[in-house]
């Protein structure tokens, strides 16, 4: 489970706008299979991590800026896809 307040503190998310954006990404746009996607993204950069480390980072149990950045990237990618899908439904 994601502890947003802990993540805000760990990664210096201070403003209301930043907090709202991060909350939206992590709660509404991060897919269920995010761990595998984050691992694959990091492997392309030559970084080896396991799924437990990814989940611990998202949950605020451990701090790893590289992993957290990859988690946010995956969520942003899915937000874009979701918004494109919504636009297609309108036409």
Locations of regions flagged by a protein language model:
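Flexible domain-boundary/linker segments
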Residues: 55-56, 71, 88
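Short, basic interhelical loop/turn and adjoining N-cap
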Residues: 33, 40-59, 80
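Basic, amphipathic alpha-helix used for nucleic-acid engagement in HTH/winged-helix/SANT-Myb modules
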Residues: 1-27, 75-91
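Short, basic-rich loop-to-helix N-cap that marks the start of a DNA-contacting helix
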Residues: 60-73
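Polyanion-binding surface elements
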Residues: 20-43
């Amino acid at each position: 489970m994601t502890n947003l307040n802990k993540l805000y503190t760990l990664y210096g998310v201070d403003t209301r706008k930043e907090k709202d954006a991060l909350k939206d990404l992590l709660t509404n746009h991060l897919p269920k299979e995010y761990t595998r996607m984050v691992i694959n993204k990091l492997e392309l950069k030559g970084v080896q991590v396991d799924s437990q480390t990814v989940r611990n980072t998202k949950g605020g149990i451990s701090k790893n800026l590289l992993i957290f950045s990859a988690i946010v990237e995956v969520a942003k990618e899915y937000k874009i896809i979701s918004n494109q899908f919504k636009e297609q439904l309108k036409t």
